[in-house]
Amino acid sequence: MKVQETRSHVHALGEEEKVMTRKQKAESKAHEVEHSPKKAKVEKEDGHINGKSETGVAEEYDEFCKATTEHLPLEQMRDILEANGLDSSGSDLEITRRCQDLLFYGALDKCSVCNGSLEFDGRRYVCRGFYSEWASCTFSTRNPPRKQEPIKLPDSVQNSLASDLLKKYQDPSHRPHRDLGLAEKPFTGMMISLMGRLTRTHHYWKTTIEKHGGKVANSIIGSTCLVASPAERERGGTSKLAEAMERSIPVVREAWLIDSIEKQEPQPLEAYDLVSDLSVDGKGIPWDKQDPGEEAIESLSAELKLYGKRGVYKDTKLQEQGGKIFERDGILYNCAFSVCDQGRGLNDYCVMQLIVVPENRLHLYFKKGRVGDDPNAEERLEEWDNVDGALKEFVRLFEEITGNEFEPWEREKKFQKKPLKFYPIDMDDGIEVRHGALGLRQLGIAATHCKLEPLVANFMKVLCSQEIYKYALMEMGYDCPDLPIGMVTNLHLKKCEDVLLEFIDKVKSLKETGPKAEAVWTDFSQRWFTLMHSTRPFNFRDYQEIADHAAAALEGVRDITQASHLIGDMTGSTIDDPLSETYKKLGCSISALDKSSDDYEMIVKYLEKTYEPVKVGDIEYGVSVENIFAVQTGGCPSYEDIIKLPNKVLLWCGSRSSNLLRHLQKGFLPAICSLPIPGYMFGKAIVCSDAAAEAARYGFTAVDRPEGFLVLAIASLGNEITELKTPPEDASSLEEKKVGVKGPGKKKTDESEHFVWKDDIKVPCGKLVASDHQDSPLEYNEYAVYDKKRARISYLVGVKYEEKEEKGAVIDTAE
């Protein structure tokens, strides 16, 4: 076996221990805390605790720590912890801190949320337990519950030099009370060095840092970080900057100080890094710690490294030698994994492959790390002479990182998630669209060689370009270049859907409040971002976030996966006309409308009447029509069938360009879930609007991508329409009855201007006016159809968003 490349993974624990050592020292010297109302039972009016001042207690604890460190060996500390039913594992620092806290202040009671163990982390008491196999508990407190019972001292300690000191605190009534209060300061225990011309003077920052618990150091040695101005970087820096880089001391922007003070928590230093790309190796900043704007730039320029189940990971460079994924007995030895547990600071991916190159040379590739942080990833590429040995090592690694057996997963998809272990991303056998679709250089050539009508060829060029899918995944935060999120199996998508629906049902009937309710949301968040690996994970807090970042995102990923299968691999020659090939796979007919036709003029009028400018910041965007395409798709009922149905209305539907290939092949799919939020409040329905403004708000993505498409559909609302003025508590009855539903918005189209188009199709074309429903959660009227056979995509309106000079009514939207 030859090892070609190795990198050691730099664990966060080491850094945490350094920080906590400083924090513990600071905490031991003095507890600079405010008096808390919670201390009323043990504090006297003069601020004394059990007859001692806070400073006195802190000094006593400091002396106690010195004595126990000197006279109590680590093994005896472990014995004490075990005798009292506490965890005796961990680093020397953790064991010492845990034992000293127990002996001086008394045994900690269990976490009130998950019944796990509480532990002091240098700033507060945090829980080390788990809500579930997916999520660690994030409960924390500054005033932990203590057991009012004597400490158990094992025989090995009874006759030790420290026994008299320890027995002094055995009786609960003699113990000092430790309450960290609410006045913990963000820079407690930190030494901060300043350099260069900052926006405020060094004197100002020295005073401010000291006010918030820190100290300012003139020397870089021993500093937590160096705060410098960007100008220092541009000038190449000084000896102080060079020394900080040599000593691997973080160099951060001034914004780190500002944000840490504002949030009253020290912010992650790597997110404010100023110089990592100047160092020889490059430290690498994980994407989830970067500014979203900087992360977006990296994402859009990044190449997808793993495109699917047969994809050889790009960094191995073995695909250039003709490398292919090793296959035996129907199993492809290529696995990708994800784990997200924000309570433990985890948001990692893992890739594991067996790759065979010509002449039957076999390689095992393994990589584990964080997106964007390659220098700190654990990575190795090994050549194996023995196939069975390589297979055994692959299986061993799978079991090590997941806690599950390999074959039951690959053959039957049997898998049980284990705490802090990885979960497989079930890749499909295909080529993800960020790899297989047309790159910028190929777009023009592909359209030139296309046999389709020029306007249709240009339309297909847009839908077959990498760009729209890269942007869509970047905007959703599912743009990890190391995992093919746009090429996962239907089984994986179904697992995501099941987890989402189960959570929504749970939260709708939730009776818990406070930390226990937060735990339900936190648990779902970790499940979700493990299954759907994100470069920007967070804890969901409300229904709107669920709608935007889970439901809509899952629908988007589902549609991008379908686009990946349709587009396949266009990376080769474009002379073979890949655009026409994809067009054939759609099984639909697309034709550009003549701009002088009645249909074209009617649609432009309908758009102009029911549109309101999209607002981004202080800028408003109008819209102009570029082209209109008539569509006949096999995924929808035919025109002949739809016109036989009652109460037909021409309505607008919002869509992103990245959703369109799936729409054109499969037709509309209903919303994935029911939420009391616009777009999802009608349950699993196809939702349309009589206002182009609503569709435009959904279709607008960003000012640097002004082109988009609005969908016009014919929907049969049926003879009976149910009007809902508030979100229904349960939409399942509506789904079962399959009746048409209308949700009145704050604005409606002027009914006096409505007209009937051909074949008795109503067109609610009228200027937008205020309705009688100003308390509605909807801005515009929305209509819901529950039967796919009652909605037909008829037109795609290609639009361009343009900055407006004059002010008008606006739609608030996020860029």
UniProtKB/Swiss-Prot annotation:
Catalysed reactions, semicolon-separated: L-aspartyl-[protein] + NAD(+) = 4-O-(ADP-D-ribosyl)-L-aspartyl-[protein] + nicotinamide; L-glutamyl-[protein] + NAD(+) = 5-O-(ADP-D-ribosyl)-L-glutamyl-[protein] + nicotinamide
BRCT domain sequence ranges: 182-274
Any matching Pfam family: PADR1_N
BP GO terms, sorted: double-strand break repair
Residue ranges occupied by any PADR1 zinc-binding domain in the UniProt entry: 39-179
Annotated compartments: Nucleus
UniProt-listed InterPro entries: ARTD/PARP, BRCT_dom, BRCT_dom_sf, PARP1-like_PADR1_N, PARP1-like_PADR1_Zn_ribbon, Poly(ADP-ribose)pol_cat_dom, Poly(ADP-ribose)pol_reg_dom, Poly(ADP-ribose)pol_reg_dom_sf
Residues covered by the PARP catalytic domain: 577-808
Amino acid composition bias (Basic and acidic residues), ranges on this chain: 1-51, 726-739
Listed EC numbers: 2.4.2.-
GO molecular function, one term: zinc ion binding
Span list, region Zinc ribbon: 106-150
EC primary class: transferase
Positions of the UniProt region annotated as Disordered: 1-52, 726-749
Binding-site positions, Zn(2+): C111, C114, C127, C137
Residues annotated as domain PARP alpha-helical: 449-568
The UniProt record lists the keyword Repeat: no
Homology family: Belongs to the ARTD/PARP family.
Function per UniProt: Involved in the base excision repair (BER) pathway, by catalyzing the poly(ADP-ribosyl)ation of a limited number of acceptor proteins involved in chromatin architecture and in DNA metabolism. This modification follows DNA damages and appears as an obligatory step in a detection/signaling pathway leading to the reparation of DNA strand breaks.
Protein name: Protein ADP-ribosyltransferase PARP3
Name of the gene encoding the protein in the UniProt record: PARP3
